């Protein structure tokens, strides 16, 4: 069985202009990603500010991306919530719109136990019958999908991957022992750890920085797959990632997507833009990175 994708999937931002979703900017951004070797596009996830999007906006964004991508790469819809029934309904609608897969975060606030996680994810997968990427991000949910739970869920025919945002390599190794990596993919959810994640057998990354450097980030994966040492190749990307860590995602990345013309530098409350000085430093760091490519 082949994986859903290998390499770089982009956790897509949502462009706003005057607090409205800018569909034309969205199309421009997606075309840029497709032209620069993105291997998958993840819509309506954390980076998209999904908690601030209405159901209608989420569906319009997803349909726009699906129509534009036209099956060239997988489109994965973020449909997970902390309510199983609502997650099912959102996932069914995503399937009806043409999504290739869904991504499901662990329930938050009314968090459950591991047995509840199994029932939650299996109920959605059973109802929707579309490939599922589990999303483990304990820094945002205060809950983790334990390796034993991943093992159980990986046996489900529609649960095919894990987005692992733990930044914990012991966790990765424990999961690897318990799954068949030929049929179940492990994607990093942390751009800054991809060198070691790839070395330890990860199949790719669901990336924030790839919103602005998709080609360069995919080239890193391709080089590693070719057996090359990618530490030096990663260093300039690492410098840009350090600059992006000035604030909480997606606040910094939208300072760069807007710089490239993909909507205004706008976020919806409770998120706020960087201070002007931080925005200037981040954009200068991006310019330095791009200039270094051309030397």
Swiss-Prot record:
Q: Which reaction does it catalyse?
A: L-aspartate 4-semialdehyde + pyruvate = (2S,4S)-4-hydroxy-2,3,4,5-tetrahydrodipicolinate + H2O + H(+)
For the keyword Transmembrane, the answer is no
Gene Ontology cellular component list: cytosol
What positions constitute the catalytic site?
135 (proton donor/acceptor), 163 (schiff-base intermediate with substrate)
For the ligand (pyruvate), the binding residues are 47, 206
Site entry (Part of a proton relay during catalysis), positions: 46, 109
Q: Which range is the signal sequence, renumbered to this chain?
A: none
Q: What is its EC number?
A: 4.3.3.7
Amino-acid biosynthesis listed as a keyword? yes
* SMART domains noted in UniProt: DHDPS
Q: What does this protein do?
A: Catalyzes the condensation of (S)-aspartate-beta-semialdehyde [(S)-ASA] and pyruvate to 4-hydroxy-tetrahydrodipicolinate (HTPA).
Q: What does the sequence similarity comment in the record state about its family?
A: Belongs to the DapA family.
Q: How does this polypeptide assemble, per the annotation?
A: Homodimer.
Q: What is this protein called?
A: 4-hydroxy-tetrahydrodipicolinate synthase
């Amino acid at each position: 069985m082949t994986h859903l994708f290998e390499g770089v999937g982009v956790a897509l931002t949502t462009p706003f202009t005057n607090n409205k979703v800018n569909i034309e900017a969205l199309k421009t951004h997606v075309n840029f990603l497709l032209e620069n070797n993105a291997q998958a596009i993840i819509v309506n996830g954390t980076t998209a500010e999904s908690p601030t999007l209405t159901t209608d906006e989420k569906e319009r964004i997803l349909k726009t991306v699906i129509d534009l991508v036209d099956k060239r790469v997988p489109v994965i819809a973020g449909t997970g919530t902390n309510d199983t029934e609502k997650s099912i309904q959102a996932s069914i609608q995503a399937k009806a719109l043409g999504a290739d897969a869904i991504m499901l975060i662990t329930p938050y606030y009314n968090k459950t136990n591991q047995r509840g996680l199994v029932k939650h994810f299996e109920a959605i997968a059973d109802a929707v019958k579309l490939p599922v990427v589990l999303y483990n991000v304990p820094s945002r949910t205060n809950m983790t999908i334990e390796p034993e739970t991943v093992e159980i869920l990986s046996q489900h025919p529609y649960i095919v991957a894990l987005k692992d945002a733990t930044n914990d390599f012991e966790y990765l190794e424990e999961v690897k022992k318990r799954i068949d990596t030929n049929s179940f993919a492990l994607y990093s959810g942390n751009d800054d750890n991809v060198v070691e994640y790839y070395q330890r057998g990860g199949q790719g990354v669901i990336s924030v920085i790839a919103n602005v450097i998709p080609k360069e980030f995919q080239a890193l994966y391709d080089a590693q797959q070719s057996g090359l040492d990618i530490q030096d190749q990663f260093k300039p990307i690492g410098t840009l990632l350090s600059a992006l860590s000035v604030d909480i995602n997606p606040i910094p990345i939208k300072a760069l997507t807007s710089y490239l013309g993909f909507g205004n530098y706008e976020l919806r409350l409770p998120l706020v833009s960087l201070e002007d000085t931080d925005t200037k430093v981040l954009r200068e760091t991006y310019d330095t990175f791009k200039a270094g490519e051309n030397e």
